[in-house]
Amino acid sequence: MAQEGWSETWTFFEGQWHEGNVPLWGARTHAIWLGSSVFDGARAFEGVVPDLDLHCARVNASARTMFLNPTVSVEEWTGLVREGIAKFAA
């Protein structure tokens, strides 16, 4: 039986995958302090990830709109997302 309130979590940070809910942000983190973060709502289901390349492109476009310089290319994002999805049972 699954533990109530628990879900499998993987976090990509500093070039590697970490299992669990790794604490990444502190009170002085720019994204928290000044709201400088971007996100997009890509979803994976039934073995597909519709428009993943477009979702990843929007993340980088949103960063540029906020005068942030994306440090990960769309192709790298796409690969990381697929790598992360593979860590979960189908």
List each model region and its residues.
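Conserved alpha/beta cores of soluble small-molecule-handling proteins
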Residues: 1-90
